């Protein structure tokens, strides 16, 4: 199946080439259509290759038959989290356009960017005539031509035989050719919009200077730079590139609309491409034109194509890109890492959201009511940071964005599949301990020791358990600080005090330059509850710390300890917006909301737990919220998700039993709930802590319930479900508790209770 022309979507009418003037200049850049794609988009597998078999040579010859490598139909991306169907590479000849015509909707003047060559502009729309394919722009007078400059059969540079057109972009037609000097391998020739465009010619010359050094497995390979005379005899430069036989990420549906990808799939694709951008940035280059059309999915990998817009970082002059994807500040700053990060965010948005369009181009911003953004909160936060109008607030590097994308992907896949996808953070430690795990069962300790126990969560419990920012390995004091990471707060302060006095400075390191050392002191002070000293040190660090998020995190912790929950929420949210793929700020926000009595942020307990089932504090927090909202069934289900391998499994089982029965009148409880609670206790060894008191609780609830209800005859916890049997069970449980009571007074109390509840003896 051959293609008549390129994709018909509306968001990309043409690229813009903007002149990025030096900061001292005042000239505004002009728009120029510079879209540069050299592979059409194939909508589905019906467009893929059906290879014809050549005639067989019947003469006997010695031949080596190459082994055929069979690839599995499914491939895994995103660290193995996402499975996609493997696409087949497309035969080059199948990519040829049978009628290489640029649609009128995509015809723009290369000089001023205004529409040209359109029937409605020439008064021909009524009679059905088409607009002129070449002529002069009615707005600026520049000549334009949308006709191919090369024809099938043309030989370029005495080496490349042109087969035809495969795409058209702002930089002109893109041609398929066969290289006669290298076994007739298929190559791609990318020409320019117009041979008279001096800036475009200069762009091609510039490409020759630095594109040859670009070598990366995720970037299309440049083979050669050649020239060929156009129809007027003027030389036109062409870049000879590797042919990529796949399909772009821009997919069209059967109805002609742009098909959106699942969020997990889109993230997985971008995770494959970000290393290529990181590589370009490392050698001082910016890609400038990331968009779905320029990402090719092949049988074995993803590749960036079309290097026509690549430029040096902070270069000024003619800067190419696509409206709707291009960062707004690029005319002022020139190409930067931040402008590339912006295109990554816009590409993710274009792949997954129904972006608004105007005049056929994507509008800035995001559709906040899009169901994708409301369903995947972390993904929405990531997009907002990537396309922040202030480039300083975007991700600082492709590596940083990749790390956060991976965290968001884990959340998305866990949410979609219901299977936790835990992963290690690159900037936060694991949880140092747990909080709120035994709050609900702790009040049953009154059976054990006779004292009332609080069921309230405290800020200190949270602070000492929360994750903490990891030590920056580039900090001068990092080797010293690594030894104090797991120390107790007092020991940490002693070690840091010794380090400040040079006692640990054996290698002559000037620890006065360290930022991490005072931050470690802040952490230890907060663990000790000394908020005043911690805040004083944070104030001293305000002008020294480049990574402000660390200060914001510790400010939030200090606010939590002082009871300023609104300020703590604000600061934790700021950290979350900076690192949307991290679980640490989500857990902190959920715990802060619980202390404040707010329910808005309880969703983060759910997010953390469903993403990483090793953070059991989140499971118990979610269960507490569900129970408080009257959803005891949901709370029990959450507690049942704690895996048997967790050291808190027993506590979860006991808590679920208490959740079923505690704080409810007998007319709110069913026999099934009583038996369910009993089964949870019965499966645990009697030597486990708190099992005896929970047995007493269950049997006591059953005894009270039976006073007004009828029960089946089956035993419960080894006793008949009768008034006599349950009294025997409660008596036995209380006497067992009396044997392990910590004080004589409480032991006598338990024995008295047992005597009161024992069934009446008959002689």
Swiss-Prot record:
<dbReference type="Pfam" id="PF16919">
    <property type="entry name" value="PknG_rubred"/>
</dbReference>
<feature type="binding site">
    <location>
        <begin position="166"/>
        <end position="174"/>
    </location>
    <ligand>
        <name>ATP</name>
    </ligand>
</feature>
<dbReference type="InterPro" id="IPR008271">
    <property type="entry name" value="Ser/Thr_kinase_AS"/>
</dbReference>
<dbReference type="Pfam" id="PF00069">
    <property type="entry name" value="Pkinase"/>
</dbReference>
<dbReference type="InterPro" id="IPR031634">
    <property type="entry name" value="PknG_rubred"/>
</dbReference>
<keyword id="KW-0723">Serine/threonine-protein kinase</keyword>
<dbReference type="Pfam" id="PF16918">
    <property type="entry name" value="PknG_TPR"/>
</dbReference>
<feature type="binding site">
    <location>
        <position position="190"/>
    </location>
    <ligand>
        <name>ATP</name>
    </ligand>
</feature>
<dbReference type="InterPro" id="IPR000719">
    <property type="entry name" value="Prot_kinase_dom"/>
</dbReference>
<dbReference type="GO" id="GO:0005524">
    <property type="term" value="F:ATP binding"/>
</dbReference>
<keyword id="KW-0418">Kinase</keyword>
<dbReference type="GO" id="GO:0004674">
    <property type="term" value="F:protein serine/threonine kinase activity"/>
</dbReference>
<keyword id="KW-0597">Phosphoprotein</keyword>
<keyword id="KW-0547">Nucleotide-binding</keyword>
<keyword id="KW-0808">Transferase</keyword>
<keyword id="KW-0067">ATP-binding</keyword>
<dbReference type="InterPro" id="IPR011009">
    <property type="entry name" value="Kinase-like_dom_sf"/>
</dbReference>
<feature type="active site" description="Proton acceptor">
    <location>
        <position position="289"/>
    </location>
</feature>
<dbReference type="InterPro" id="IPR031636">
    <property type="entry name" value="PknG_TPR"/>
</dbReference>
<dbReference type="GO" id="GO:0106310">
    <property type="term" value="F:protein serine kinase activity"/>
</dbReference>
<protein>
    <recommendedName>
        <fullName>Serine/threonine-protein kinase PknG</fullName>
        <ecNumber>2.7.11.1</ecNumber>
    </recommendedName>
</protein>
<feature type="domain" description="Protein kinase">
    <location>
        <begin position="160"/>
        <end position="406"/>
    </location>
</feature>
<comment type="similarity">
    <text>Belongs to the protein kinase superfamily. Ser/Thr protein kinase family.</text>
</comment>
<feature type="region of interest" description="Disordered">
    <location>
        <begin position="1"/>
        <end position="32"/>
    </location>
</feature>
<dbReference type="InterPro" id="IPR011990">
    <property type="entry name" value="TPR-like_helical_dom_sf"/>
</dbReference>
<dbReference type="GO" id="GO:0019222">
    <property type="term" value="P:regulation of metabolic process"/>
</dbReference>
């Amino acid at each position: 199946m051959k293609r008549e022309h390129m994709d018909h979507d509306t968001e990309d009418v043409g690229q813009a080439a903007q002149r990025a003037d030096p900061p001292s200049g005042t000239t505004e850049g002009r728009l120029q259509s510079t879209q540069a794609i050299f592979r059409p988009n194939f909508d589905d597998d019906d467009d893929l290759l059906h290879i014809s078999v050549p005639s067989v040579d019947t003469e006997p010859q010695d031949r080596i038959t190459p082994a055929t490598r069979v690839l599995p139909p499914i491939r895994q991306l995103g660290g193995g989290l996402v499975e996609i169907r493997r696409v087949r590479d497309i035969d080059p000849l199948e990519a040829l356009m049978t009628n290489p015509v640029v649609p009128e909707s995509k015809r723009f003047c290369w000089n001023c960017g205004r529409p040209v060559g359109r029937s409605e502009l020439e008064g021909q729309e009524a009679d059905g005539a088409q607009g002129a394919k070449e002529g002069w722009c009615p707005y600026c007078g520049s000549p334009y031509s949308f006709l191919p400059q090369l024809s099938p059969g043309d030989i370029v540079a005495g080496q490349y035989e042109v087969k035809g057109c495969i795409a058209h972009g702002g930089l002109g037609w893109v041609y398929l050719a066969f290289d006669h000097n290298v076994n007739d391998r298929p190559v791609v020739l990318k020409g320019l919009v117009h041979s008279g465009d001096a800036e475009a010619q200069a762009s091609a010359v510039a490409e020759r200077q630095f594109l040859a050094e670009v070598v990366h497995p995720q970037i299309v390979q440049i083979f050669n730079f050649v020239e060929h005379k156009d129809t007027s005899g003027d030389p036109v430069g062409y870049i000879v590139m590797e042919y990529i036989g796949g399909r772009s990420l821009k997919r069209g549906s059967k109805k002609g609309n742009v098909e959106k990808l699942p969020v997990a799939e889109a993230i997985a694709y971008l995770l494959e491409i970000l290393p290529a951008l990181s590589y370009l940035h490392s050698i001082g280059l910016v890609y400038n034109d990331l968009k779905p059309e320029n990402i090719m999915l092949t049988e074995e990998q993803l590749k960036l194509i079309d290097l026509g817009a690549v430029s040096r970082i902070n270069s000024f002059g003619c800067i190419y890109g696509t409206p709707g994807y291009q960062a707004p500040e690029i005319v002022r700053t020139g190409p930067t890492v931040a402008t590339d990060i912006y295109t990554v965010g816009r590409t993710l948005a274009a792949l997954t959201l129904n972006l608004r369009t105007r005049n056929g181009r994507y509008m800035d911003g995001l559709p906040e009511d899009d169901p994708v953004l409301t369903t995947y909160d972390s993904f929405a936060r990531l997009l907002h940071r990537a396309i922040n109008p202030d480039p300083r607030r975007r991700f600082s590097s492709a590596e940083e964005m990749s790390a956060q994308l991976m965290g968001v992907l884990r959340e998305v896949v866990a949410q979609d599949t219901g299977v936790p996808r835990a992963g290690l953070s690159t900037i936060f430690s694991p949880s140092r301990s747990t909080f709120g795990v035994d709050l609900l069962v702790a009040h049953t300790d009154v059976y054990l020791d006779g004292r009332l126990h609080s069921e309230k969560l405290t800020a200190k419990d949270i602070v000492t358990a929360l994750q903490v920012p990891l030590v920056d390995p580039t900090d001068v004091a990092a080797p010293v600080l690594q030894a104090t990471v797991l120390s107790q707060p007092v020991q940490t302060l002693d070690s840091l005090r010794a380090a400040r006095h040079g006692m640990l400075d054996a290698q002559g390191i000037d620890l006065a330059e360290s930022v991490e050392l005072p931050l470690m002191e802040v952490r230890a002070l907060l663990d000790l509850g000394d908020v005043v000293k911690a805040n004083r040190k944070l104030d001293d660090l305000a002008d020294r710390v480049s990574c402000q998020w660390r200060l914001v995190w510790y400010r939030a912790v200090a606010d939590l300890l002082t009871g300023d929950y609104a300020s703590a929420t604000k600061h934790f949210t700021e950290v979350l917006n900076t690192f949307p793929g991290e679980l640490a700020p989500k857990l902190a926000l959920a715990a802060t909301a619980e202390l404040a009595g707010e329910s808005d942020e309880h969703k983060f307990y759910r997010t953390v737990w469903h993403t990483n089932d090793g953070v059991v504090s989140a499971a118990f927090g979610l269960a507490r919220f569900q129970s408080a909202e009257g959803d005891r069934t949901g709370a029990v289900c959450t507690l049942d998700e704690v895996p048997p391998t967790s050291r808190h499994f027993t506590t979860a089982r006991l808590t679920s039993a208490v959740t079923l029965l505690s704080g409810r009148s007998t007319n709110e409880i069913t026999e099934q709930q009583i038996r369910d609670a009993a089964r949870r206790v019965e499966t645990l060894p009697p030597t486990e802590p708190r099992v005896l008191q929970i047995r007493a609780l269950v049997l006591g609830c059953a005894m009270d319930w039976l006073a007004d209800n009828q029960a089946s005859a089956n035993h419960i916890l080894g006793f008949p479900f009768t008034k006599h049997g349950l009294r025997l069970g409660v008596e036995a449980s209380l006497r067992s508790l009396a044997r392990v009571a910590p004080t004589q007074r409480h032991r006598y109390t338990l024995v008295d209770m047992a005597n009161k509840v024992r069934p009446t003896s008959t002689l």
